[in-house]
């Protein structure tokens, strides 16, 4: 566990429980403040503080909740070989449920927004000519690919490029070396997914509709970008320049790779001119970049 106030990374436990069910919160030996006040806070308060980008709330979520989830997952029986990647999904199954929920909302939102647009790319026109099942599968694959590529790129850049979590001091002194890789992966993953989930707020627009989606979507994406950068700064302690460049580069990689793979996957099932549709997707991406530049 870590202290969410000063970042001290060798807190043995966040609270002590006595026979009378009396709970005493641990005090950080470095700053002499309560190591993690959110242990006794309601989840709603934590959610609101995360929306407000409070530093302590994000450290509690990314570091301490992730460690508690890891301890619970590791304590349960797991019959598959320990070397398999399935152990990660078993250990962090609550994180996997959170990602699944975010993806489910994102699929619905992306699908609904595309239907509301008057002009679509050639690929989307091809998809909308298919049955609802094929459309649903397409948007599931689209959202999954985009999130996978974005998070993978960001993990590689921050951990290999900027050496986050590789210094002489561990980011969490309680984590064993063999569990450190999965823990660091989860810390960055939960930070990026939760801070980026602000993109889901336009779901409210289906209740209170806005007139111009083409303006609203770039604005929401820009807010999400700022939100992710600020959350990553709190969790990783890297500078704004490094994080802005890392996230921007990861988004470009995500868009290029995901669009290319989507065209390739759809081509396996539908007959169309691959080159024409691919260049149309790249042109759409170029237009989006120009839109964001105008917003900035």
From Swiss-Prot:
Gene Ontology CC: one annotated term: Golgi apparatus
Mutant phenotype after disruption: Leads to avirulence using a BALB/c disseminated mouse model.
Protein keywords: Endoplasmic reticulum, Glycoprotein, Golgi apparatus, Lipid metabolism, Lipid transport, Membrane, Sphingolipid metabolism, Transmembrane, Transmembrane helix, Transport, Virulence
GO terms of biological process kind: intracellular sterol transport; regulation of plasma membrane sterol distribution; sphingolipid metabolic process; sterol metabolic process
Membrane topology classification: Multi-pass membrane protein
Subcellular location: Endoplasmic reticulum membrane; Golgi apparatus membrane
TM segment ranges: 99-119, 121-141, 187-207, 212-232, 233-253
Function noted in UniProt: Mediator of sterol homeostasis involved in sterol uptake, trafficking and distribution into membranes. Also regulates the sphingolipid metabolism. Required for growth during anaerobiosis and sterol uptake. Plays a role in pathogenesis.
Protein name: Protein ARV1
Native source organism of the sequence: Candida albicans (strain SC5314 / ATCC MYA-2876) (Yeast)
